[in-house]
Structure formats: structure tokens, C-alpha cells
Amino acid sequence: MAYEIVCESESKRYRSDCASVLTKTCEILKSKNIIAQFSLVGSGAKNLITRNGNGPYDLDYNLVVIKADERYWKDLRLLKDTVRNALNKAERKDFFSDAMDSRSCLTTLLHFNDSPNVEFSFDVAILTKNRNGDYMRLIHNKNAFCFGYDQYTWNEVPKSHDVKEKADAIKAEGLWQEARDRYVELKSMYLSRQDNTHPSFVVYVEAVNEIYYKYFR
């Protein structure tokens, strides 16, 4: 199996529903003293929703925490649980399943009664920025001995602070299709290796950096 890009017209309805859920999620989080913004991975450039063969369509979102009470920074389990509970509260239960806590994101499945054979995997990664401006992903180390079992940590995404500017430069030069193709190639490569340590945003940053340095260095 290998990933392929889903056409934008095909995914428009589902992006709209997911965006609505995440807008409500951010409103709920604000009432909990967490200020956050969400974005579809690769949004602002071109559609990067993928599908692995006949598997679920993948909608990958980043939820970037901009500001939060100190208690959340001191207790990352509390932060992730608060986001998960807000996401569950915001979801329309006739369409969405409850969010599951995976290693690097919250995952829920999206179903529609009029399209029973269509299933979407709706993944929400929790991010923030460090002092250097690079993104960091909230990771639940369920079985990583080096961190201690069942620990929560921030994991830096290298060379990610200016990924939007690099993507804009690539698009301006008419090279975005090459970046999209490389994104799909990398996702498929990691899939073939059964590598679960490279979620979509990490792969996106890798693809953008690779194409950027190929033409602009």
C-alpha cells in the first residue's frame, strides 16, 4: 500500500465539519484558560489530505497552544486530557467517535450516514513553540523506557520555525506540486518501514525543507 492525495473537492465537506469541531474546541479551551489555534497540515498552500489505499482518509490538524495557565505546562497529562475532553465535548456524536489518545496526537473517526463506506481518520496533534520558534509536539511516551513509562514530553520538530515562509516561497516559484509529491513519497516510505515516529506534520516539514534547500540554497 502507498499514500495518495485526495482531491480537494472530495474532501471539502469533511474539512468543513472538522474545522467546525476545532473552532468549538478552541472556544471550550479558552474557558479553561488555554488559548490555542488550529490549522490543517499544509493549509495555506494546497490540499494535502491523503489516503492509504482503501483505508481511511487522513485529515491531520495541528492545535497550537499559544498561552495557558502554568498548571498545564507543569502537568502535560492534564493539558492533553483537557484538550481531549474539549474535543469530545465539541464533536457531534452522530458523526464522530470519542478521541483516542495515541502517542503523538488525538485520533477520532468520522462517519456519515449517507456515505457509510467512507471513513475519515481525524488526527489532532498538540503543539507549541520553543524560544527558537521551532514547533514542539506533545508526546505520550507510553512504552519508552528512556523517559519512564507513561510519561508526557515535548518533542522538537527540527527546522520548523519558518516552514510557512519556505512553503510560500516554493509555491511562488511554481514548485508546490514537487513538494506535494515528495510529501506523499515520504509518508509512503515511513509506512513501508512501519515507522510510527514520523506523523504528518513532521513529514510535511521534512518535505518542505528538502524542496526548499534543493532550489533556494
PLM ranges: what are they?
Residues 25-41, 92-107, 194-206, 215-217:
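Short glycine-rich, low-complexity/disordered patches
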Residues 9, 13-16, 20, 74, ...:
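Alpha-helix boundary/N-cap detector
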Residues 1-40:
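Helical scaffold of the NTase/Pol beta-like nucleotidyltransferase catalytic core
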Residues 68-74, 92-95, 153-161:
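Short C-terminal domain-edge/linker segments immediately following a structured domain
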Residues 16, 20-27, 81, 85, ...:
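Charged/polar, solvent-exposed surface patches and flexible loops
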Residues 29-33, 77-132:
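Conserved catalytic core of two-metal-ion nucleotidyltransferases
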Residues 102-105, 115-217:
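Right-hand nucleic-acid polymerase module
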Residues 27-59, 63-73:
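Active-site nucleotide-donor binding segment shared across nucleotidyl transfer reactions
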